[in-house]
Structure formats: structure tokens, C-alpha cells
């Protein structure tokens, strides 16, 4: 099976690619520094493969990159796309872009599988680490269900080696945390001492987060915990 993986050198891709190769797939990485050097925001060479696993993402232009990728696909029988829980329920610009990517995949005519995942442990750590740089740490009143990139990678590899399944069950971490607990865990682990102050997230997005629209209480759950992740840093 010939598989092309976009973003195969990133946080998620570095776990997905070895899993696919271990399963016997012929894997080509398409990224700025991959087997095929390519910026999906520019001209994309023709992609001939059985399966495309689309993991590449950035701060801007994900919808454009996804449309460029889809236009370059030739004879692809299955496209696996990673998205984010809350893409259709949390009114933030970057999540609207993720939903636009999903819409483009669904309208492409290519058989597809879309997996929405929760925020990765890596991103959660970056967020709380950034907050902890302040002398007084603002703690948003929200809950998160962070998932380990390895758990998401395992699920994506299974999906890529299987048949197109459309939208599959969301995947989140094994536990739900209040943001204050995530911050407290990081401060304790890193030996930092900070005053924390609760803050209310404003607007419709804040309401969505307070309502748990970023969670997957009825979805699938990974096995690696936030505590294990922190201990390994």
C-alpha cells in the first residue's frame, strides 16, 4: 500500500509514519523537509498514492492548503484527515478554518475518513507554560480533555490501513481537567511558585468552552494521561 503523509515530520506525523512503515506500507512524507519538499500553500505536485493522510497544519491557511492538496490527488482511494473537536461548535476563527477543511474533504469526491481529536498534551503544555511566565497567572474557567499525540497517531494509522469510514468517533484523553488543575500540575512539576487568578472567558466562544463543546465525553479515549506526559518532560 502506497501512502503519502502530509506533515509527516511534525508533532503527530513523527508518530504516524513509523507505525505505517512497521505495518508494511510504502510511506512518502510530504512536508517542507520531507521526502517530497512542498509547501501546501503553494504549488503542490501531483500526488499518486492509494492513501493520503493529511496531518499538515499551521497558524493560517489550512483551508487553502487542504484544497490545494485535494486538487493534486490522482487516483487516491482514501484520504484520512485530522481535525479538531469543536470545529463546528466553538466559534473561533481557527476552528472555523478546520471546519472549512472538513467541508472541502467531504466535497472532494475522494473517499475519506475524518477524525476529530482533542488538544494534544504538547499544546496544552505550551499553553500553561506560557501562562506561567507571568508573575500572576490568569486561569480561564474552562475544562480540557487533552490527548496524547501517540494515541491519536495509533488511531490514525489504524484508519489509514482500513477502509474509508466518513466521520468517525472523536478521540480525546482519558480524563477531563479543569484548567486550574492543569496549571497547578505544571507549576508543581516545574517547581514554580505563582499566584493564580481565575478569569472568565468572554463571548460566545467562552460560553462554548464553559459548556464543554471542546470535550468528547461520549467519544473514544486514549490511554496516556496528562500526569504521565508531564512526568516524562
What are the functions of these language-model segments?
Residues 2-25:
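N-terminal Rossmann NAD(P)H-binding glycine-rich loop of SDR-like oxidoreductase domains
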Residues 74-78, 110:
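A short helix->loop->beta-strand "cap" motif at the edges of active sites that frequently abuts
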Residues 10-11, 150-233:
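Mid/C-terminal beta-alpha module of Rossmann-like enzyme folds, strongest
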Residues 6, 30, 55-56, 79-84, ...:
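SDR active-site strand-loop-helix element
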Residues 6, 63, 91-102, 142-150, ...:
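Short-chain dehydrogenase/reductase
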Residues 83, 88, 102-123, 172:
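Conserved beta-loop-beta element that borders a ligand/cofactor-binding pocket
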Residues 29-74, 84-93:
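NAD(P)H-binding glycine-rich loop region in Rossmannoid oxidoreductase-like domains
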Residues 126-147, 151, 163:
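A conserved pocket-lining segment of Rossmann-fold NAD(P)-dependent short-chain dehydrogenase/reductase
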Amino acid at each position: 500500500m502506497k501512502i503519502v503523509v502530509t506533515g509527516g515530520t511534525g508533532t503527530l506525523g513523527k508518530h504516524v509514519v513509523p507505525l505505517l512503515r512497521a505495518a508494511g506500507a510504502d510511506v512518502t512524507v510530504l512536508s517542507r523537509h520531507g521526502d517530497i519538499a512542498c509547501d501546501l500553500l503553494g504549488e503542490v505536485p501531483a500526488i499518486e498514492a492509494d492513501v493520503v493522510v493529511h496531518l499538515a497544519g499551521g497558524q493560517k491557511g489550512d483551508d487553502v492548503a487542504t484544497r490545494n492538496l485535494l486538487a493534486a490527488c490522482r487516483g487516491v482511494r482514501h484520504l484520512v484527515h485530522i481535525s479538531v473537536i469543536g470545529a463546528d461548535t466553538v466559534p473561533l476563527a481557527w476552528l472555523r478554518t478546520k471546519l472549512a477543511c472538513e467541508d472541502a474533504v467531504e466535497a472532494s469526491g475522494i473517499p475519506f475518513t475524518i477524525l476529530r481529536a482533542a488538544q494534544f498534551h504538547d499544546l496544552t503544555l505550551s499553553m500553561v507554560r506560557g501562562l506561567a511566565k507571568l508573575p500572576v497567572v490568569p486561569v480561564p474557567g474552562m475544562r480540557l480533555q487533552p490527548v496524547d499525540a501517540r494515541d491519536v497517531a495509533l488511531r490514525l494509522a489504524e484508519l489509514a490501513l482500513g477502509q474509508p469510514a466518513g466521520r468517525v468517533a472523536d478521540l480525546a484523553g482519558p480524563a477531563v481537567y479543569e484548567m486550574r488543575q492543569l496549571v497547578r500540575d505544571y507549576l508543581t512539576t516545574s517547581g514554580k511558585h505563582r499566584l493564580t487568578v481565575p478569569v472568565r472567558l468572554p463571548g460566545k466562544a467562552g460560553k462554548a468552552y464553559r459548556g464543554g463543546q471542546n470535550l468528547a465525553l461520549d467519544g473514544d479515549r486514549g490511554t496516556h494521561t496528562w500526569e504521565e506526559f508531564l512526568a516524562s518532560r
